[in-house]
């Protein structure tokens, strides 16, 4: 299936990846889908901001803990792109994200069941943002097949792979307009 892509969003994705590479010369780009529960939860427009803030806090706590343990820590700045979509069949709101993290610390999502892995932190942060129990609803954070791509500064092939995978976030067909909520966002600086 071919999609129409928003060129402004594609440019913002490109700029975000380039900014991330300016900060960290070796990155892991990780795709994740965040779904909403069928139970009452905090699913307002600010849920994605709460998620990002919760994930940043977990990353910071993880790095501080590793430092206290005397382990080498590579300071990381979380860069990200997100898109809000509505399912084509059921029309249910969900989010797609690409997270960019320093590869020296996270070369993959890690063990999906381990709370201290990057995947575990993502699941916990999403449940925290929603205000739901992480033990019961952690499957709302979904990782597609082969969610991670590595890239390095001056690696045109890796850069193109990341942009091609991230194009999915810039597709127009499943966005809702006129709702007062943003359909797309990315980290700044």
What are these regions (language model features)?
Residues 47-48, 98, 112-116:
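Short intrinsically disordered coil segments
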Residues 79-106:
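Histidine-centered divalent-metal-coordination microenvironment in nucleic-acid enzymes
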Residues 42, 64, 91, 104-111:
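Short, solvent-exposed secondary-structure capping/transition elements
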Residues 17-87:
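Signature for HUH/AEP ssDNA processing cores
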Residues 31, 94, 135-139:
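A structural signal for short, well-ordered beta-strand segments and their strand-loop junctions
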Residues 1-24, 103-189:
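Catalytic "initiation/cleavage/transfer" segments centered on a nucleophilic residue
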């Amino acid at each position: 299936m071919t999609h129409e892509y928003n060129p402004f969003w594609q440019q913002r994705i490109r700029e975000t990846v380039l900014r991330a590479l300016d900060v960290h010369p070796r990155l892991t780009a990780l795709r994740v889908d965040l779904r909403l529960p069928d139970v009452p939860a905090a699913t307002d427009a600010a849920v994605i901001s709460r998620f990002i803030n919760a994930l940043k806090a977990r990353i910071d706590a993880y790095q501080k803990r590793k430092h206290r343990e005397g382990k080498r820590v590579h300071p990381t700045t979380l860069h990200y792109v997100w898109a809000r979509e509505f399912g084509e069949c059921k029309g249910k709101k969900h989010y797609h994200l690409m997270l960019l993290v320093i590869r020296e610390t996270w070369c993959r999502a890690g063990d999906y069941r381990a709370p201290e892995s990057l995947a575990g932190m993502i699941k916990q942060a999403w449940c925290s943002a929603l205000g739901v129990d992480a033990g019961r609803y952690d499957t709302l954070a979904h990782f597609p097949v082969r969610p991670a791509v590595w890239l390095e500064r001056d690696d045109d092939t890796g850069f193109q792979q990341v942009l091609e995978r991230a194009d999915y976030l810039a597709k127009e067909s499943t966005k809702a307009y006129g709702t007062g909520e943003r359909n797309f966002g990315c980290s700044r600086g």
